[in-house]
């Protein structure tokens, strides 16, 4: 992965977020992460959020070719409210947002834009919690769907990568581990 630090990023299409702090894409068959150094105030969360998009590319690709790959969009969607569909747009998420979903199904209204953003928000927050020294986050406890998404994504990451040399608990899994210990 190549990482590019840049100045202000702005949307040049109707489909994108107006002022992104970063994005992940491909350039000459390499995954690149581009970060806006002017708008990024929470580097740990933003970098982890964008890294999650690269992880998603790996998991989605692998799920097409590995018969028993854990990751699937169908499994992910099973943790969402009945009849829920992601907006598949960065615009107007606020008008579709239900406060009843907050901390139960989704972290925030940005999480309902795309499934990839939902996962990125969860992963980014888990890493930010680790960097802040938090080993407990009540949003990621118990049997609620948000915690089930978090645990599922952690398991998918372990399933989708060669974990040789990894710690038994990685930084993004610390909230999961604290739940196991309690």
Residue spans for each PLM region:
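Short, well-ordered secondary-structure micro-motifs within conserved domains or adaptor modules
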Residues: 1-5
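Active-site-flanking segments in enzyme catalytic domains
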Residues: 6-182
């Amino acid at each position: 992965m190549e990482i590019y630090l840049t100045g202000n990023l702005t949307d040049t299409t109707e489909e994108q977020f107006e002022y992104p702090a970063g994005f992940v894409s491909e350039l000459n068959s390499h995954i690149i992460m581009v970060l806006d150094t002017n708008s990024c105030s929470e580097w740990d969360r933003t970098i982890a959020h964008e890294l999650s998009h690269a992880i998603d590319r790996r998991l989605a690709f692998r799920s097409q070719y590995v018969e028993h790959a854990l990751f699937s969009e169908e499994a992910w969607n099973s943790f969402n409210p009945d009849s829920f569909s992601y907006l598949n747009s960065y615009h107007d998420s606020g008008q579709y947002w239900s406060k009843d979903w907050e901390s139960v199904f989704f972290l925030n209204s940005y999480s309902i834009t795309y499934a990839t953003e939902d996962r990125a928000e969860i992963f980014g927050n888990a890493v930010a919690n680790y960097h802040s020294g938090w080993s407990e986050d009540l949003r990621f406890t118990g049997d609620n769907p948000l915690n089930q998404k978090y645990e599922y994504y952690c398991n998918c990451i372990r399933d989708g990568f060669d974990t040789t040399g990894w710690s038994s608990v990685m930084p993004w899994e610390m909230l999961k581990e604290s739940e196991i210990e309690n």
